């Protein structure tokens, strides 16, 4: 792999267009753990809401991935790929924030995640 020149990087950036979007979490989830864990992952809700985002002119969505999701590595990656496929279908460029664990000091991967952040 070669390093791009400043001109190559600038050219690539100019081809991307203006990014318009938001932080994304489906309405059926309380946090990023619920978005991707097995019991609460809902691709139908995700698809509907990504379609709505595209419909109002968004072209990017930022998604946070909690480090606890890697406990279900293989299954998590399947669900994550489903999410990426959905983004691709609607021409949404996801911005992925890796290993975000700052939302709650004692996170768990169970269905009792509905803690209020204090």
How should each PLM-predicted stretch be described?
Residues 1-118:
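Active-site mouth of glycoside hydrolases
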């Amino acid at each position: 792999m070669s390093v791009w020149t400043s001109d190559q990087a600038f050219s690539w950036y100019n081809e991307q267009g203006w990014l318009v979007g938001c932080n994304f979490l489906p309405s059926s989830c309380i946090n990023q753990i619920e978005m991707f864990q097995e019991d609460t992952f809902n691709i139908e809700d995700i698809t509907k809401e990504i379609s709505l985002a595209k419909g109002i002119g968004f072209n990017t969505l930022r998604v946070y991935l909690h480090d606890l999701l890697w406990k279900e590595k293989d299954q998590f990656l399947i669900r994550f790929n489903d999410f990426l496929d959905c983004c691709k279908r609607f021409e949404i460029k996801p911005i992925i924030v890796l290993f975000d664990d700052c939302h709650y000091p004692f996170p768990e991967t169970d269905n009792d995640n509905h803690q209020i952040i204090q």
